[in-house]
Every structure is written in structure tokens, then in C-alpha cells.
Regions:
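Intrinsic-disorder-associated interaction segments
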Residues: 7, 11, 33, 205, ...
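N-terminal cap/recognition module
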Residues: 1-15
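Intrinsically disordered, low-complexity regions of eukaryotic proteins
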Residues: 5-7, 36, 50, 73, ...
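Acidic carboxylate diad motif detector
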Residues: 14-125, 221
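Short, flexible coil/linker elements and helix-boundary hinge sites characteristic
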Residues: 5-9, 20-22, 57, 114, ...
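Positively charged, helix-rich recognition surfaces that bind polyanionic ligands
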Residues: 110-113, 125-347
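A generic secondary-structure signal for well-formed alpha-helical elements
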Residues: 2, 51-58, 158, 191, ...
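Surface-exposed helix-capping loop/turn segments at secondary-structure junctions
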Residues: 2-6, 55-60, 244, 282-289
Length: 347
């Protein structure tokens, strides 16, 4: 179509051409009809949106996404307003697949409870299939009984230090995580040996390499789940105190990652994911999230008198003010300064 008319073809028009002209005249592509029509339609509309973003200068030229390298394997939606996507406590009905049992029961709101499932996706990670659904829920009323604000300072020694006195340890230093990291190194070495053996013409089978890859992927997935769960628990516990606002620092994570001695530790802390999840939770509960500029000297400023200690080193874990004699943990002092900071942006 583009070669003949030299114009951009919208998604809806391309879908009509594909179904009414191209596939009937090209029998070798009839396999497209074997999957759900909504999945094909969604792929076309995704490409339509990607090209429109490119033409508007919002993003770069779209790249072809190979199916085997994508986590999302299937997309399904409601066909019209009168139909529903059936879901029960222990199973969900997926187009072309039928009823599929769910391992974790009771996580998805069911249609019997009055909820409406608008769409869903089936994805695969580390050899396991996951289904996620978009559910229409009634607006929840947020409580307005707010207390005072709090400041949160993120770090490497401890993950988060809160101005109310709470300190959340670095989970990557626990024996549980270290044990998984040790096992991950061992499995990665085994995978490397199999690759080297295959290059040298050894007897290693590709099926065995695939099995070893799954072992490594499962360990990575488990590590990611442990860290994400820890972040969710910290945010939930913080939001339950019902602060009127939460203040955090706009960390330059990309710049911090350039330090080769700290890059691994910084990446494992997942600072950006913490900010994104906190932002969503604050919006859900009507809490104001304040973002302080990264150049604000929260650690070097005395919370008692306001003087700035410019010679404070990263190795100095205790803040001692030469002006007024105030002494406190440097991270706790920073969280207090973030709480009282008056120059900020609202996320």
C-alpha cells in the first residue's frame, strides 16, 4: 500500500487491507487467522502508535521486535461492551486457549464478584507463564486524616532512612540474598563452560544449554522478586502512616552508575523503581510527593543551625556541626533536611 500510494497507512485501514485483500490472495499467510483476531489487531495498533510517535518527533524510528525476545506472548481484549472475559477464582478463559488454570488462586478479581476485565496479556519469564489483566474498579475513597510530612534519604549502607526514625536495611547484605548470588555465580560459570565446549566442537547439546539458561534466568527472576517485594513493603509501611507529603531526592542514578566501584551496588538497590512505585502509591492515596533537586546539600547541611559542612566526606558516617555542635547520623540528618526543604518539584 505504501509503495503504491506513498503515504502513511493508519492502523484501521491496514487491518482492513490485511484481512480483505492480502490474506485471501496469499494462502501461505493464513496462519495469521489461527490466533485471536484481537491479538493481531492490537499488534497493528501498537505499530500505528509507534509510527505516529516517530512522525511527531516523540520517539525514534520503530524497530522490529522479534517475538522470541519479547516477554509478552499474547494480548486479548473484550470484543464488545456486551461480552465479558470469564474469570473464576482458580481459572481464566483466554481466547483460542479456553479455560486455563491459575497457580495462585484469588489474586484476580472475578466476574462473579461484579468486576469487569477489560483486557489481558500472557507473558513468559524464566520459563514460567504469567497472565495480567486490566480490571475496571470503582473509585476508592481516600482518607484525609493526614499527619505531618516525612523525608526519605536513600543510600547504599542502608536502603532508606526516614525522618520519623525508621531505618530500612540494605536487603542485598542479608544472608538470603548473598546465598542466591553465590548460587547464581556458580550457575553462570557452568553456562559459560557449556558455551566454550560447544565452540570447541565438544559434545555439549543445545538442549542442555537451554536448560542451564533457564536455571540462570530463574535465579535472576527470584532476585528481582525479592528486591521488588522489599520495596513494596517499605512503601506500604510508609504510606500507612498517612503523611501529608513525602520528600525524596532526585538522584542522578545514571551518573552514579559511572562509578565502576559502586555501579553493581547501585543497580541492585533499584532506586528508580522505588521512586516510580512510591509515586503511584502516593497518587492512589492522595499524598503529595515532593522531589528535591539533586544538587541540594541535604547531607552537608546542619539540620539544627543550617550551616553547610562543605568538607564532609563519603566515608564520614556521622555528621558533626562545627558551628553549633549538633551530632547525628549523616543519613538521618539528610532525611530531616529533605523533610523541611522548601524548594522542590511535585511529581
Amino acid at each position: 500500500m505504501y509503495e503504491k500510494e506513498k503515504r502513511f497507512v493508519p492502523g484501521m485501514e491496514f487491518s482492513k487491507w490485511l484481512n480483505n485483500e492480502f490474506i485471501p490472495n496469499n494462502p501461505e499467510f493464513k496462519w495469521v487467522k489461527e490466533v485471536s483476531s484481537k491479538s493481531v489487531k492490537q499488534s497493528i495498533m501498537d505499530a500505528d502508535r509507534a509510527f505516529k510517535d516517530f512522525f511527531q518527533g516523540k520517539k525514534h524510528f520503530p524497530k522490529f521486535k522479534k517475538k522470541s525476545k519479547s516477554d509478552v506472548k499474547m494480548y486479548f481484549v473484550k470484543t464488545d461492551c456486551n461480552t465479558i472475559i470469564p474469570c473464576e477464582r482458580h481459572r481464566i478463559k483466554i481466547p483460542t486457549l479456553g479455560w486455563v488454570r491459575i497457580k495462585e488462586k484469588g489474586y484476580i478479581p472475578t466476574t462473579k464478584s461484579g468486576y469487569t476485565i477489560k483486557s489481558g496479556t500472557v507473558s513468559i519469564r524464566a520459563g514460567r507463564f504469567y497472565v495480567s489483566v486490566l480490571v475496571e474498579l470503582p473509585d476508592a475513597e481516600t482518607s484525609r486524616a493526614f499527619t505531618g510530612g516525612i523525608g526519605i534519604d536513600l543510600g547504599l549502607q542502608d536502603f532508606a532512612i526516614v525522618s520519623n526514625g525508621k531505618t530500612y536495611k540494605n536487603i542485598n547484605k542479608t544472608s538470603k540474598v548473598k546465598k542466591i548470588e553465590k548460587k547464581l555465580k556458580r550457575e553462570q560459570r557452568e553456562l559459560s563452560r557449556k558455551y566454550e565446549n560447544l565452540k570447541k566442537g565438544g559434545l555439549t547439546q543445545k538442549a542442555n544449554i537451554h536448560k542451564q539458561q533457564l536455571k540462570v534466568q530463574k535465579l535472576h527472576c527470584r532476585m528481582n522478586n525479592i528486591r521488588a517485594d522489599y520495596i513494596n513493603k517499605i512503601i506500604a509501611e510508609t504510606v500507612k502512616t498517612k503523611p501529608s507529603y513525602i520528600t525524596i531526592e532526585n538522584l542522578n542514578v545514571k551518573g552514579m552508575m559511572k562509578n565502576r566501584h559502586l555501579s553493581k551496588a547501585i543497580a541492585s538497590q533499584k532506586f528508580y523503581e522505588f521512586r516510580i512505585r512510591l509515586q503511584a502509591k502516593c497518587k492512589e492515596n492522595g499524598i503529595e510527593l515532593r522531589i528535591v533537586d539533586r544538587f541540594y546539600p541535604s547531607s552537608k547541611t546542619c539540620h539544627n543551625c543550617g550551616s553547610v559542612k562543605s568538607d564532609l566526606k563519603l566515608s564520614d558516617r556521622t555528621f558533626h556541626c562545627a558551628e553549633c555542635g549538633y551530632t547525628a547520623d549523616r543519613d538521618y540528618n539528610a532525611s530531616l533536611n529533605l523533610k523541611d526543604c522548601q524548594t522542590y518539584d511535585i511529581a
